[in-house]
UniProtKB/Swiss-Prot annotation:
Endonuclease that specifically degrades the RNA of RNA-DNA hybrids. GO terms for cellular component: cytoplasm; ribonuclease H2 complex. Residues 25-213 form the RNase H type-2 domain. It comes from the Bacteria. Gene3D superfamilies: Ribonuclease H-like superfamily/Ribonuclease H (3.30.420.10). It comes from Magnetococcus marinus (strain ATCC BAA-1437 / JCM 17883 / MC-1). It is an enzyme of class 3 (hydrolase). This is Ribonuclease HII. PROSITE patterns: RNASE_H_2.
Length: 213
């Protein structure tokens, strides 16, 4: 018997948690954007959805066009509670990208807690940050399973894309508004031609090998 492909994120995880644990009244989804780029911060978001007022068309950010992500970004901010956190390039280089991503997630949940009490977090990926201020559960490929995580993925992605578009204005040779800092051929060529900027991650190999020894 062939298994059907997962139809996309839904509220099964959220509803199961709310049913099984009466101590959980409010839960958030958490995701990050920007682990792979050669430059710019890593950004995380934590989102508590209003289960009775979900944004129409909510899906994993990777399945959406840039225009649809922008539309949903605005809808999520109107209908939901949102916290955003980031880790800087300096923190990425000092900690490594994994630990910097965990730090950004902790900051996002902490920011969200400034708005309301959060009892539980659904974290995209295979680990829960050690210093997360609330109990958490890791969900592998969570942005394709949980609508709360999918919403967080959209907030994190659009927030970071906007940051890279701003940086692109100061450093137009690198094409960051288009590539978001990922190691595209055009970005690598510009890096070799124009050099390393203060926004590049010096611990990442394509950048590190261009630094003076």
């Amino acid at each position: 018997m062939r298994h059907k492909a997962h139809p996309g994120p839904d509220l099964e995880l959220e509803c199961a948690l709310l049913r099984s644990n009466r101590a959980i009244k409010t839960l958030c989804g958490v995701d990050e954007a920007g682990r792979g780029p050669l430059c710019g911060p890593v950004v995380a978001a934590a989102v508590v959805l209003d289960l009775d007022n979900l944004p129409v068309g909510l899906n994993d950010s990777k399945q959406l066009s840039a225009k649809k992500r922008e539309q949903l970004f605005e809808q999520i901010y109107v209908t939901s509670q949102v916290g955003v956190g980031e880790a800087s390039v300096a923190e990425i280089d000092a900690l490594n990208i994994l630990h910097a991503s965990m730090l950004a997630m902790v900051r996002a949940v902490t920011a969200l807690q400034g708005r309301l009490v959060v009892d539980h977090a659904l974290i995209d990926g295979n680990r829960v940050p050690a210093t997360l201020p609330v109990p958490g559960q890791a969900v592998v490929k969570g942005d394709a399973k949980s609508l709360s995580i999918a919403a967080a993925s959209i907030i994190a992605k659009v927030t970071r894309d906007r940051i890279m578009a701003e940086l692109d204005r100061d450093y137009p040779h690198y094409g960051w508004a288009k590539s978001q800092g990922y190691p595209t051929q055009a970005h690598l060529q510009a890096l070799a031609l124009h050099g390393v900027t203060p926004h590049h991650r010096r611990s990442f190999k394509p950048v590190k090998q261009l630094l003076p020894h």
